[in-house]
Swiss-Prot record:
This is Light-independent protochlorophyllide reductase subunit N. Signal peptide: none annotated. The keyword Iron-sulfur applies. It comes from Nostoc sp. (strain PCC 7120 / SAG 25.82 / UTEX 2576). Protochlorophyllide reductase is composed of three subunits; ChlL, ChlN and ChlB. Forms a heterotetramer of two ChlB and two ChlN subunits. SUPFAM superfamilies: Helical backbone' metal receptor (SSF53807). Its EC number is 1.3.7.7. Its cofactor is [4Fe-4S] cluster.
C-alpha cells in the first residue's frame, strides 16, 4: 500500500534521452486492415523489410495488402530512375490487386537520399489512374503510433470539400449510417433520423476497430448527435466530407499532426476533449462534444456508475498500488488518468513527446483526478533518459512498470513487475465497455505473481546453491 501525500500540480520535466520505440512504419499493421480497399507500399531497405516481416507475422501466401519496395545500391547511387521503378511496381499492384488507393510509406532512407516522393506521386497517379497518398512515416518520429498520425494527416488532404449531390455518391459515402441501418425498414430509419438534434456536422478521426467505431457512434447517437463520418473510413472511397467550419474530434492522444492539418488546411474546428479511454474519459469526451453543440447530456452519470460497478473485481486488485510509465506510445497520460481513478498512485509518466495543446484537456483531467482521489500528482517526464528512469524505479519501488518491450525482461529479472505498453496500442481500450480490457492487461502481471506465490515460486532468477 502507498501512503497518500498532499496532491500537487503536475510537474513537467524534459530529459535528453534517446527514443526507445518501434519504427512508425509499423502503422501499416493496423491501417491496411482498417482501410479495406488500400494497398501500402513501404519504400525502404532490407532492414525495413525484416522489421515488417517480424512485426506483422503474416505469411507471404496470405497475400497481404502491403508490400516492400526494397531500395538497392543503384537507387542510392542514382543509377536507377526512381519514377520508372515506382511506376513498374504500382502497375504491378494495379494489375494484381486493383486497390482504390496506394499509400507510399517513406522511410529513413528515402529521407536521407532525398527521394522526392511527393513530386513523383501526382504524375504517376495521373498515369495509372489510382490515387497515391504519400506519408513520411519514418524512424525520425518520437513514437511508433505517430505513423498513423502521418498517414491520417496525408489522407485529410484527400477528403472531399463538398457534400455529394448525386444519389449514388451519397450512398457510397454514408457507410457508417448504412452499417447502423442495415436490415431496418425505411420508416424506422426516417423515424431515427428525426431523433438527432440539429447541430453542425461532426467528423471523428482516429483508426479504431469497427466494433468500437459502432459503439462510440451509438453513444453519441443516444445524445442526439450524428457522426457525419470517420477518418479513416473503411474504404478510401468513403472518406468523410470536410467543409470549412465542420467540427472534428480525435479519439487518440497521438494524432496532433492530423488535428493541426484539419484545422489549418481544411479550416475545421477542433473539439479539445479528453480521449474516450476508460469510463471517466469516455464520459468527459461525450460531455465536451455535447457542450460544444449546446446539448444537455442524458444518462451519463448512471452509465459511468454502472461501468465502474462492473469493474470492481479488477479495481480492488490495484487500489492503493503504484504504477510507473517509462514512455512508449503516447497513450501514457490517458492511461495514467484512468488508473488514478481506479485508486492507483502514478509515480511518473514518461512520454516520448508531449503536445500540450492537443492534450490540454487530458492533462487538466489527470490533475483533477489526482486532487479528487487524494493522491500526489505524477512527475511528467518528456523524452526520458532510460538510465535515470531505472535509478528512479529502484528508489520508488513501484508495484507495476508499464514499459516498452526492450526493458520488460531486464526489469522482470530484477524482481519488478512489468507490462508491455505496446499491448495497449493493439487492444480495444476505447469506450465504456472496453474499460475492462484495460484492467485485464494492467492486472495480469499482478495476478500472475499472486498465482506463483501460491505455488511457492517467489523469485524469477534461480539462486546459486551453497555447497
Amino acid at each position: 500500500m502507498t501512503i497518500a501525500q498532499e496532491p500537487t500540480a503536475l510537474n513537467f520535466e524534459c530529459e535528453t534521452g534517446n527514443y526507445h520505440t518501434f519504427c512508425p512504419i509499423s502503422c501499416v499493421a493496423w491501417l491496411y486492415q482498417k482501410i479495406e480497399d488500400s494497398f501500402f507500399l513501404v519504400i525502404g531497405t532490407k532492414t525495413c523489410g525484416y522489421f515488417l516481416q517480424n512485426a506483422m507475422g503474416v505469411m507471404i501466401f496470405a497475400e497481404p495488402r502491403y508490400a516492400m519496395a526494397e531500395l538497392e545500391e543503384g537507387d542510392i547511387s542514382a543509377q536507377l530512375n526512381d519514377y520508372a521503378e515506382l511506376k513498374r511496381l504500382c502497375e504491378q499492384i494495379k494489375r494484381d490487386r486493383n486497390p482504390s488507393v496506394i499509400v507510399w510509406i517513406g522511410t529513413c532512407t528515402t529521407e536521407i537520399i532525398k527521394m522526392d516522393l511527393e513530386g513523383l506521386a501526382p504524375k504517376l497517379e495521373g498515369e495509372i489512374g489510382i490515387p497515391i497518398v504519400v506519408a513520411r512515416a519514418n524512424g525520425l518520429d518520437y513514437a511508433f503510433t505517430q505513423g498513423e498520425d502521418t498517414v491520417l494527416a496525408a489522407m485529410a488532404h484527400r477528403c472531399p470539400d463538398k457534400a455529394p449531390v448525386a444519389e449514388a455518391e451519397k450512398n457510397e459515402r454514408n457507410a457508417v449510417q448504412k452499417l447502423l441501418n442495415f436490415g431496418k425498414k425505411k420508416e424506422l430509419v426516417a423515424q431515427e433520423e428525426s431523433e438527432y438534434v440539429d447541430h453542425p456536422p461532426l467528423v471523428l478521426f482516429g483508426s479504431l476497430p469497427d466494433p468500437v467505431v459502432t459503439q462510440l457512434t451509438l453513444e453519441l447517437k443516444k445524445q442526439g448527435i450524428k457522426v457525419s463520418g470517420w477518418l479513416p473510413a473503411k474504404r478510401f472511397t468513403e472518406l468523410p466530407v470536410l467543409e470549412e467550419g465542420y467540427y472534428v474530434a480525435g479519439v487518440n492522444p497521438f494524432l496532433s499532426r492530423t488535428a493541426t492539418t484539419l484545422m489549418r488546411r481544411r479550416k475545421c474546428k477542433l473539439i479539445g476533449a479528453p480521449f474516450p479511454i476508460g469510463p471517466d474519459g469516455t464520459r468527459a469526451w461525450i460531455e465536451k462534444i455535447c457542450s460544444v453543440f449546446g446539448i444537455t447530456p442524458k444518462g451519463l452519470d448512471e452509465r459511468e456508475a454502472q461501468i465502474w460497478a462492473g469493474l470492481e473485481d479488477y479495481v480492488k486488485l490495484i487500489r492503493g498500488k503504484s504504477v510507473f510509465f517509462m514512455g512508449d506510445n503516447l497513450l501514457e497520460v490517458s492511461l495514467a488518468r484512468f488508473l488514478v481513478r481506479c485508486g492507483m498512485t502514478v509515480q511518473e509518466v514518461g512520454i516520448p513527446y508531449m503536445d500540450k495543446r492537443y492534450q490540454a484537456a487530458e492533462l487538466a483531467m489527470l490533475e483533477k483526478a489526482c486532487q479528487e482521489m487524494g493522491v500526489p500528482s505524477p512527475k511528467m517526464v518528456e523524452k526520458p533518459d532510460n538510465y535515470n528512469q531505472v535509478q528512479r524505479i529502484y528508489d520508488l519501488k513501484p508495484d507495476l512498470v508499464i514499459t516498452g518491450m526492450a526493458h520488460a525482461n531486464p526489469l522482470e529479472a530484477r524482481g519488478i513487475n512489468t507490462k508491455w505498453s505496446v499491448e495497449f496500442t493493439f487492444a480495444q481500450i476505447h469506450g465504456f465497455t472496453n474499460a475492462r480490457d484495460i484492467l485485464e492487461l494492467v492486472t495480469r502481471p499482478l495476478r500472475r505473481n499472486n498465482n506463483l506465490k501460491d505455488l511457492g515460486w517467489d523469485k524469477l532468477v534461480r539462486e546459486e546453491a551453497k555447497i
